């Protein structure tokens, strides 16, 4: 076989070699290129940013309103809609959505959705307004309530849990009904805690709660056992005309202000280890058979043990 390279192949090699040589010469003769980072984009004016955020917020609110309209026709979407509204509060605590919820949680509303659950854990809720609503479970564990929290005439047909929550202003539960008990253990009430005329069925706990201002349980009706063990009542406190169907437990409680149990009735009152402050000008009216012992210095002030 011949070892001579065919002419066409030699021509192809020459052409490629020439092209490469020309490219090298061209790159050598061009000035060096210096790469500089591009300048950061100009920030948007504050007014534009605020408008975009407002538009985005309004779009989300409109989507929730549309979902509520769909849920009116499809009951299977109703709990999802309620959950989405509560999720919106996580990123936008002041969202104007309480009116939307009330429209669907009030029994006298033509758009009432029965059997809805409210479930919020470790969040912030502002200006809560559930007046006259009826829900099944109400779980608000470790929630911070900013502004007044309105639960007047609210009916809870299932479990209720406010454990370790904090009310920064007034907590208003006038005439609320807890049909399966409630848990307010370790809850902090910074402003007025108003529970006049409430009714409970099932065990109810306020153990280790802190009431910093006026506390009102006047005419409350506790259908089963209730415990205020270790509670701190710093302001004026009233249980006037309250009704306890079982033993009312106030063991280790602290009463730092006025205390009024006039007309309160229980199967028995237990105040073991409870104390009342005696070095401030306050008035105390205890249930029959309950008296204060000799005052003793304790930080702060002087306290007497109830017995």
Regions found by a protein language model. Give the residues of each.
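Membrane-embedded hydrophobic alpha-helical segments
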Residues: 1-40
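N-terminal leader/targeting and pre-domain segments
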Residues: 42-307
């Amino acid at each position: 076989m011949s070892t001579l390279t065919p002419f066409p192949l030699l021509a192809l090699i020459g052409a490629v070699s020439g092209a490469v040589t020309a490219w090298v010469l061209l790159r050598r003769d061009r000035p060096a290129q210096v790469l500089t980072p591009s300048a950061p984009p100009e920030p948007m004016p504050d007014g534009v940013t605020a408008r975009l955020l407002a538009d985005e917020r309004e779009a989300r609110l409109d989507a929730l309103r549309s979902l509520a309209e769909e849920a009116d026709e499809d009951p299977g979407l109703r709990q999802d809609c309620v959950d989405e509204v509560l999720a919106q509060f996580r990123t936008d605590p002041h969202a104007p959505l309480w009116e939307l919820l009330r429209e669907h949680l009030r029994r006298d509303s033509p758009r009432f959705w029965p059997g809805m659950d409210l479930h919020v854990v470790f969040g912030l809720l502002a200006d809560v307004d559930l007046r006259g609503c009826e829900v099944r479970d109400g779980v608000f564990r470790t929630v911070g309530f900013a502004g007044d929290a309105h639960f007047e005439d609210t009916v809870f047909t299932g479990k209720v849990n406010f454990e370790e929550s904090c009310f920064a202003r007034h907590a208003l539960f006038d005439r609320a009904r807890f049909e399966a008990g409630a848990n307010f253990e370790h809850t902090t009430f910074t402003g007025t805690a108003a529970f006049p005329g409430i009714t409970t069925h099932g065990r109810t706990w306020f153990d280790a709660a802190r009431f910093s201002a006026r506390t009102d349980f006047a005419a409350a009706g506790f259908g089963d056992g209730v415990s205020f063990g270790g509670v701190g009542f710093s302001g004026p406190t009233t249980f006037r005309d309250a009704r306890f169907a079982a033993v009312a437990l106030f063991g280790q409680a602290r009463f730092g202000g006025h205390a009024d149990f006039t007309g309160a009735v229980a199967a028995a009152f237990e105040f073991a280890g409870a104390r009342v402050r005696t070095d401030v000008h306050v008035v105390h009216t205890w249930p029959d058979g309950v008296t204060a012992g000799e005052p003793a210095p304790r930080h702060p002030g002087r306290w007497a043990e109830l017995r």
